[in-house]
Structures are given as C-alpha cells and as structure tokens.
C-alpha cells in the first residue's frame, strides 16, 4: 500500500494499492469498521491487552460524529476501490498479518495518527507477539531487516542511578495534568498519576 508502485520488491509479486498520499489512516479506519461490523476482530486480545476500545469503536461506527468510517467513505478519500478494501479486511484476519509502516508517514501533518491506527489495527487482528504477525515501523529504512549484523558499541557517559519512582506513558501527560491522583491502567497494571 503506497503511492509508489516500486516500494515493494518485484520478487514479492505483491498486489499494489495505489493510495493517495497521507490517507493511510482513513484506509485503516475503514478496515477497522469492517472488522467491527462483521464482528471478526479478536475480542479476547482487545479485552486483555487494550484500554478504550469501546470509545474507539463508537468513533469508527459514527456514533460520536455521525460519520462512520465505511469502505465507501475511505474509497473516496484514498482512491482505493471499495472491493479492494473489503478484500483486504478479510485477508487481515484469515492470513498471517504483519503491519509494517514506513517512518515517513509520521512526517506529515497529524503524522502520529497512522502509527497509532496501525497499532490499533494490529491489536484488532490479535497477532502481536506471534511469529510473522504484529506491527513494525521503519523496517525498510534500516537496511538490516532479516539480516544479522554486528552491533558496534557507542561511546557514552555513565548514566548514574535514576531516583525517580513515578512513571506515566508519555501519551498520558495531558491526562496526568488534568487528573492528578487518579489511577490508570497501563500494560496490565494500575498506576496513579502524580500531582506535579
């Protein structure tokens, strides 16, 4: 899936989806819409490893803004035919799926959204942590995908001991500032926002 046909090596004989640049999130939202409406996403994975899926699903289905993220909606934005979108959704859940995204996606306006959506879609598929499944970023840019290489040690200064015990995920800074002292779930554990 790329505006450029030569993004994938020819030997893969891959089907090319000529997406309009910067519309990847719309495509993935429509794939999520299909998985939700077909009730074909991995509910066990979602319930065990994620927080907030009900709110996300409500958005995708158009319950919050009366704008469901249907394949028809996405096709108009992405230039990918509806049939290709629906077929791709089917393949996501019936085949081994690795969502590999280029780092270049985050260099656009609202560039965090395709990366967040890629992870969300990978969670819905439920193959994170399985051989050949899950998600990854920037594999095409590091020139060592699938190859072993020698790590060269970098010079660095000693770091010392970190005496800070409080922890919050960086994506929750706003929540911490707005809700000091409240608890939140992260990585299967409960934490408390510090009052700073």
State each model region's role.
Residues 1, 25-29, 123-196:
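Extended redox/cofactor-interaction regions of prokaryotic respiratory oxidoreductases
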Residues 4-94:
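Long, well-ordered, tryptophan-enriched scaffold segments
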Residues 9, 27, 108-110, 145-146:
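Short helix/loop capping segments that flank catalytic or ligand/cofactor-binding pockets
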Residues 14-16, 95-99, 132-135, 195-196:
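Beta-sheet entry/capping signal
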Residues 42-43, 85-86, 98-100, 127-137:
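Acidic/polar loop patches that form or flank catalytic/metal-binding clefts of enzymes
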Residues 66, 86-98, 183-196:
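Glycine-rich phosphate/diphosphate-binding loops that line cofactor/substrate pockets in enzymes
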Residues 73-77, 102-110, 141-142:
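Conserved short loop/turn motifs at secondary-structure junctions
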Residues 113-123:
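Basic, amphipathic alpha-helical segments enriched in Lys/Arg and hydrophobic/aromatic residues
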């Amino acid at each position: 899936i790329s505006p450029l046909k030569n993004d994938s090596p020819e030997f893969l004989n891959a089907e090319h989806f000529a997406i309009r640049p910067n519309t990847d999130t719309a495509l993935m939202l429509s794939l999520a819409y299909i998985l939700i409406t077909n009730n074909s996403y991995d509910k066990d994975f979602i319930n065990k490893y994620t927080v907030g899926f009900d709110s996300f699903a409500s958005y995708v289905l158009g319950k919050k803004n009366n704008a469901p993220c249907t394949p028809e909606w996405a096709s108009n934005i992405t230039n990918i035919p509806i049939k290709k979108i629906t077929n791709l959704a089917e393949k996501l859940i019936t085949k081994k799926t690795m969502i590999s995204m280029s780092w270049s996606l985050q260099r656009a306006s609202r560039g965090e959204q395709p990366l967040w959506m890629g992870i969300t879609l990978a969670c819905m598929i439920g193959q994170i942590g399985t051989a050949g499944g899950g998600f990854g970023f920037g594999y095409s840019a590091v020139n060592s995908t699938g190859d072993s290489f020698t790590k060269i040690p970098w010079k660095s200064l000693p770091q010392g001991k970190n005496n800070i015990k409080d922890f919050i995920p960086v994506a929750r800074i706003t929540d911490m500032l707005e809700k000091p002292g409240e608890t939140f779930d992260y990585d299967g554990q409960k934490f408390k926002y510090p009052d700073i």
